[in-house]
């Protein structure tokens, strides 16, 4: 495994209680897939270690972790090893924060909150996928990413409205699980 290529082990977003809002774990080719129980344990370990500090830079479970608290949301970028390039991880974190703020912006605020994060989850996942793929950092230039993810606000709003309308129609047919 070439550690210079596979820099990222995970991107993790947690709420103020340490509950997962989003997590993307990356396992390089030829390595076993990390079991869900280990991912959960690692997320809890990160939160417990960082909840009393800003977690700008930590070594957790032999991995470099860089994180930031934004309102009621914690964002972490986890390096693949102790040899991970902290500056590359910081570039990824700063790009994530900037793009998340754009996605979560409202008329009143540009803060990333749990509510706005979840409302814009699909767009945020697209941003994450443009930045990192399979643990490889592909792009950290914000403008390039914004040009590649051409979802306008009204297009996303129309999609959300269509989903809500479909849920209402499904309820009319007795589908109570929606």
Swiss-Prot record:
InterPro entries assigned to the protein according to its UniProt record, in alphabetical order: AP_mu_sigma_su (IPR022775), Coatomer_zeta (IPR039652), Longin-like_dom_sf (IPR011012)
Keyword presence, Kinase: no
Keywords, ordered alphabetically: Cytoplasm, Cytoplasmic vesicle, ER-Golgi transport, Golgi apparatus, Membrane, Protein transport, Transport
Gene3D superfamilies: 3.30.450.60
Pfam families with a match to the protein in the record: Clat_adaptor_s
GO CC term, one of those recorded: COPI vesicle coat
Membrane topology: Peripheral membrane protein
Compartment(s) where it occurs, according to its Swiss-Prot or TrEMBL record: Cytoplasm; Golgi apparatus membrane; Cytoplasmic vesicle, COPI-coated vesicle membrane
GO BP of this protein: intra-Golgi vesicle-mediated transport; intracellular protein transport; retrograde vesicle-mediated transport, Golgi to endoplasmic reticulum
Quaternary structure, from the entry: Oligomeric complex that consists of at least the alpha, beta, beta', gamma, delta, epsilon and zeta subunits.
Stated role: The coatomer is a cytosolic protein complex that binds to dilysine motifs and reversibly associates with Golgi non-clathrin-coated vesicles, which further mediate biosynthetic protein transport from the ER, via the Golgi up to the trans Golgi network. Coatomer complex is required for budding from Golgi membranes, and is essential for the retrograde Golgi-to-ER transport of dilysine-tagged proteins. The zeta subunit may be involved in regulating the coat assembly and, hence, the rate of biosynthetic protein transport due to its association-dissociation properties with the coatomer complex.
Family: Belongs to the adaptor complexes small subunit family.
Protein's name in the database: Probable coatomer subunit zeta-B
Organism: Dictyostelium discoideum
């Amino acid at each position: 495994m070439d550690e210079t290529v596979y820099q990222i082990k995970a991107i993790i977003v947690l709420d103020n209680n340490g509950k997962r809002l989003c997590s993307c774990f990356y396992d390089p080719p030829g390595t076993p897939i990390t079991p869900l129980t280990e991912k959960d344990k690692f997320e809890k370990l990160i939160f417990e270690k960082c909840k009393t500090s800003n977690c700008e830079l930590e070594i957790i479970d032999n991995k470099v972790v860089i994180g930031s608290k934004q309102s009621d949301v914690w964002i972490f970028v986890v390096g693949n090893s102790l040899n991970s390039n902290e500056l590359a991880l910081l570039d990824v974190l700063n790009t994530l924060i900037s793009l998340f703020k754009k996605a979560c912006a409202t008329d009143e605020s540009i803060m990333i909150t749990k509510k706005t994060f979840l409302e814009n989850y699909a767009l945020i996942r697209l941003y994450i996928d443009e930045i990192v793929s399979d643990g490889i950092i592909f792009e950290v230039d914000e403008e390039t990413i914004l040009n590649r993810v051409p979802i306008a606000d009204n297009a996303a709003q129309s999609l959300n409205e269509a989903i809500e309308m479909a849920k209402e129609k499904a309820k009319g047919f007795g589908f109570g699980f929606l």
